[in-house]
């Protein structure tokens, strides 16, 4: 996948020179969210948001006609469970994307190195986890580039192509700027309240949320700070594979979209 990422970064940077300025687009903050479906059908973000994400090459969903799913984790800080999560992923030969912050890179460098060594993608969750709609264009670039540079320094991975905006807050301006700087925003179509470390409810809570919400093309968001997630992951992966789902990487998703619509993505 490293060769694809190098090629993709080059292509994205090339087209960024021809991007329109972000000064003319809206900076109205949008909080990512959707009405959950429990009938194994993908949620619909609505025509306006779908068009906005497509305009800037962002994703929240894969192909809803295929039982292919994408496992992603947000790593704001280390809470002692990432090693177990990595062990489970290795056991099942499943690759994921881990969106890390500057704090995580500074405090858990060995885990970040392990992620890349074991075939996972390290994504960008910004250096200091700000609301991107409240900071300048220069600051947005610094937030993203600092993570990307540190990941490359630690692991050799060529850039953090994929960005998950902190707290899911974004605007058309932040989408335009991140694309201009060579990044692609990745949202999600399956998530639940799992980040409250003092309100964990047991592995079954996480397992049921994943299995009840799963749908073709799902981009799954989990937080590594959750003991429930770490304890549920093994059984969840077993069940999903038994149901015929295949785990794919974000590189697979983007490559597929680029071949389908080369001038859009």
UniProtKB/Swiss-Prot annotation:
PROSITE patterns per UniProt: NODB (PS51677), PROKAR_LIPOPROTEIN (PS51257)
GO BP field: carbohydrate metabolic process
InterPro entries documented for this protein: Glyco_hydro/deAcase_b/a-brl, NODB_dom, Polysacc_deacetylase_ArnD, Spore_PdaA
Gene3D superfamilies from the UniProt entry: Glycoside hydrolase/deacetylase
Protein name: Uncharacterized 30.6 kDa protein in fumA 3'region
Coiled coil: none
Domain NodB homology intervals: 67-248
Enzyme nomenclature, EC number: 3.5.1.-
PANTHER family reported for this sequence: GLYCOSYL TRANSFERASE-RELATED, PEPTIDOGLYCAN-N-ACETYLMURAMIC ACID DEACETYLASE PDAA
Organism: Geobacillus stearothermophilus (Bacillus stearothermophilus)
Keywords assigned by UniProt, alphabetized: Hydrolase, Signal
Family recorded in the similarity comment: Belongs to the polysaccharide deacetylase family.
Signal peptide: 1-23
Pfam family, one: Polysacc_deac_1
GO molecular function: hydrolase activity, acting on carbon-nitrogen (but not peptide) bonds
Enzyme class: hydrolase
Keyword Signal among record annotations: yes
GO cellular component: membrane
């Amino acid at each position: 996948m490293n060769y694809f990422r190098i090629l993709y970064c080059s292509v994205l940077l090339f087209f960024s020179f021809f991007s329109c300025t972000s000064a003319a687009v809206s900076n109205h903050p949008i909080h990512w969210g959707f009405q959950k479906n429990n009938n194994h059908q993908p949620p619909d973000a609505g025509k306006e948001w779908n068009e906005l994400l497509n305009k800037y090459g962002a994703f929240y969903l894969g192909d809803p006609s295929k039982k292919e799913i994408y496992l992603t984790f947000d790593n704001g800080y280390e809470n002692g469970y990432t090693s177990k999560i990595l062990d489970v992923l290795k056991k099942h030969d499943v690759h994921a994307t881990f969106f890390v912050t500057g704090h995580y890179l500074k405090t858990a460098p060995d885990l970040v190195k392990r992620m890349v060594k074991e075939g996972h993608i390290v994504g960008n969750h910004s250096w200091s986890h700000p609301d991107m709609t409240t900071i300048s264009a220069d600051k947005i670039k610094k937030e993203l580039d600092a993570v990307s540079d540190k990941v490359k320094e630690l692991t050799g991975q060529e850039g953090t192509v994929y960005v998950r905006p902190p707290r899911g807050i974004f605007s058309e301006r932040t989408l335009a700027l991140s694309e201009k700087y060579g990044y692609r925003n990745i949202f999600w179509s399956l998530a639940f309240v799992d980040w409250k470390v003092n309100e964990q409810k047991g592995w079954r809570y996480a397992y049921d949320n994943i299995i009840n919400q799963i749908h073709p093309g799902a981009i799954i968001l989990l937080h590594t700070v959750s003991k429930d997630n770490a304890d549920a992951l093994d059984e969840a992966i077993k069940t999903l594979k038994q149901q015929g789902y295949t785990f794919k990487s974000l590189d697979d998703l983007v490559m597929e979209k680029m071949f389908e619509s080369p001038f859009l993505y």
